[in-house]
Design a protein with these regions (language model features):
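Generic recognition of stable, solvent-exposed alpha-helical segments in well-folded globular domains
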Residues: 20, 24-28, 108, 112, ...
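Extended oligomerization regions of viral-like shell subunits
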Residues: 150-266, 270, 276
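Alpha-helical scaffold segments that mediate packing/assembly in large oligomeric complexes
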Residues: 92-171, 290-297
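Residues immediately flanking
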Residues: 59-60, 97-99, 182, 274-276
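Assembly/oligomerization interface modules of large self-assembling protein complexes
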Residues: 14-93, 157, 162, 287
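Protruding loop/beta-arch "assembly-hinge" segments enriched in small, turn-prone residues
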Residues: 1-27, 36-38, 45, 261-297
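Short helix/loop capping segments that flank catalytic or ligand/cofactor-binding pockets
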Residues: 64-67, 105, 187-190, 281-283
Length: 297
């Protein structure tokens, strides 16, 4: 009996329109997603051994409350190591392309679509884990800040940045990163102390000596800044990337220039839906704070 193997440089996309993405492709995508995702850069990775759920262990500070699963939190009265249930959820993206790609080899198709797939995945992960936008997860950095009453309302100023830091320092949280956006940089440069010295170093992109990472998302508004100790953001990736290619139907989440949904058959296009399993969890309840416009508080 001849065993058939998948050879990306020979198999056409039209011959394999659904399944698990080839390991070689998955490894490349996950490497580039990890290099760009702020959740993956700032958070703590836990190996899930291919499981949907995994018990991991977290060191507590003996003062704060900690989430041990999606719905249960405990109050600790002494430093200890507690078991935490990390549970993966599905995140999906949809991309569209011309129908001619069905005649590409998988190797050529991957080369052309990889940048879009990578960007779509890391954007989806960060919007879910940091902002709580269209998230399957029970918590996010922004939600944790709101739930802990650690939201400062107002513009990006020296005084408000200090208030943002104080929200965390009052709980003995050591800030190790700010999440901002490039459009905030002019305001950050103008954040000056009483001696008119700026607390933002544009060369190193540090604010008050702490690293700033910039998020690209239309759902993260100008003037918004997240702060916290991101060691309390944990994640794991148990499975490969699965995909399915469709040639018919309408795509309501992606629209034409006139606002109408894309009709795949009529417009001779295809839709690629890719899903990955990822677990993202906030462990410490008071580890994050947010600065946002006063109208949002």
């Amino acid at each position: 009996m001849t065993i058939q193997t998948f050879t990306p440089d020979k198999v056409l996309v039209s011959e394999k329109k659904d399944g698990t993405l080839h390991k070689e492709f998955t490894d490349i995508i996950m490497k580039e997603v990890a290099e760009n995702s702020l959740v993956m850069q700032l958070g703590k990775y836990h190996e899930m051994d291919g499981k949907q759920e995994k018990t991991v262990y977290v060191q507590t500070d003996g003062v704060s409350a900690y989430w041990v699963n999606e719905t249960e939190k405990i109050k600790t009265d002494k430093p200890e190591i507690v078991p935490v249930q990390l549970r993966a959820k599905k995140l999906g993206i949809i991309l569209v392309a011309s129908r001619e790609v069905l005649n590409y080899t998988w190797e050529k198709f991957f080369e052309e679509m990889k940048p879009q797939i990578v960007e779509a995945f890391y954007t989806k992960i960060d919007e879910a884990g940091l902002l709580g936008h269209e998230t399957p997860f029970a918590n996010s950095v922004a939600k944790a800040a709101k739930d802990a009453s650690k939201v400062v309302g107002g513009p990006v100023t020296y005084e408000n940045i200090l208030k943002l830091e104080d929200k965390l320092l009052d709980s003995d949280v050591e800030i190790n990163a700010f999440v901002s956006r490039v459009s905030n940089r002019s305001a950050l440069r103008e954040a000056r102390d009483g001696d008119k010295k700026t607390i933002y170093d544009k060369e190193s992109n540090k604010l008050d000596g702490i690293i700033v990472v910039d998020m690209k998302s239309k759902n993260f508004k100008k003037g918004d800044i997240l702060a916290g100790n991101f060691d309390n953001l944990i994640y794991g990736v148990p499975y490969n990337i699965n995909y399915k290619i469709s040639e018919e139907g309408q795509i309501s989440t992606i629209q034409n220039a006139d606002g109408t949904p894309i009709n795949l058959f009529e417009q001779e296009m295809i839709a690629i839906r890719a899903t990955m399993d990822i677990a993202v969890m906030i462990t410490k309840t008071d580890a994050f704070a947010k600065l946002t416009d006063a109208s949002n508080v």
